[in-house]
Amino acid sequence: MKRLLCLLLAVLTACFCAGCGWMDGSYVSVKPHQVGYSQSSGDITSVDGPAGLRKAVTGLIDSGKTEAIMTLSGYPEAQARSDMEKVITYCIQSYPIGAYAVEEIRYEIGQGLLLLQIEYRKSKAQIDRIQSVRGNSGAQEAIVKALSNCADSLVLQVTLYSEMDVVQYIADYAAENPDVVMELPQVTVQIYPQSGNTRIIELEFSYQNSREKLREMLSQVRQIFSSARLYVTGDADDSMKLSQLYSFLMERFDYVIQTSITPAYSLLNYGVGDSRAFAQVYAAMCRQSGLEAMTVSGTCNGESRFWNIVRDGENYYHVDLLECAQLGRLRKKTDAEMTGYVWDYSAYPACAGEPETVQTEPEN
């Protein structure tokens, strides 16, 4: 209010010097705001109707401006007041950046002038950091980049927006890319406004490890994945590559079966991991070496279990690294051989190849 009155005083002074008076206007009620910063528009804008008024106000919001003077060129003041109320409602409830950033809009109208003040709950720097992307695919690319950088926040303006489960997408990406996401963050999502083809998505990522520590982990894990790719013979067949990657991973440690919040890092650097960590890391190493591999979620003898389905030549097989560790070798199994296992059969390819021939030592 104080700033608006100061602006009004300046205009009154100008009007007095020009030999004109000022008529009483009106303004909307003011709520306490969290963030205020001063940046006036500098120029006087002329508006002559509701379309121009909306364009002028949204332009101020896009620029993070807090104050403006507008002349009402042939625009009846009573109509301007009515239209201004509609513009305020639109900007705060429906206009994406306004719904995200604006706390309150106040105004005075009189003698053919409109004085405007905008108060924000987001800082100018926060508004400037909004990234514009197109569609959900563009949003996903930006999210992946933020995860790779261990960022703590991300704000996107998404055109051609369609509903998407951001939290689930992040979880799925982390599972598919254990060499990129060291720790699955807690994710808070806010979307502004609640409808429309263009939305602001505000994401906050919360990690238990510091950004510096996560980046250190990422560097070490990427080096190990690079070593795994070099370990594989380039012209070998699928069966040989699968065996080589199995040896690379399983011969690193005498593993301790335990869950960690940094699955790939703990598994590859300290030999600590659970079935999920083994399956996700092995699948990622296989894919990076040109093999088809996926992680399966199910149960084994009634307990939660993760394992892999891999492609060997023309056939798919199950590989449970925890079972392989007990056997001391890579074991590929068909669906029929998966006694005690339960999974969503419709979500994965059938493993109906020839059962693996197991070599046995001849009896004396």
Write out the residue ranges for each language-model feature.
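N-terminal accessory/pre-domain segments preceding catalytic cores
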Residues: G21-G234, Y345-N364
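Positively charged n-region of N-terminal signal peptides that target proteins for export
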Residues: M1-L4
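Hydrophobic/aromatic-rich core segments of domains that either
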Residues: A277-V342
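Secondary-structure boundary elements
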Residues: N209-L268
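Periplasmic OmpA-like peptidoglycan-binding domain that tethers envelope proteins to the cell wall
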Residues: L267-R276
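Hydrophobic helical h-region of N-terminal Sec-dependent signal peptides
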Residues: L9-A14
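C-terminal motif of bacterial Sec signal peptides marking the signal peptidase cleavage site
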Residues: C15-G19
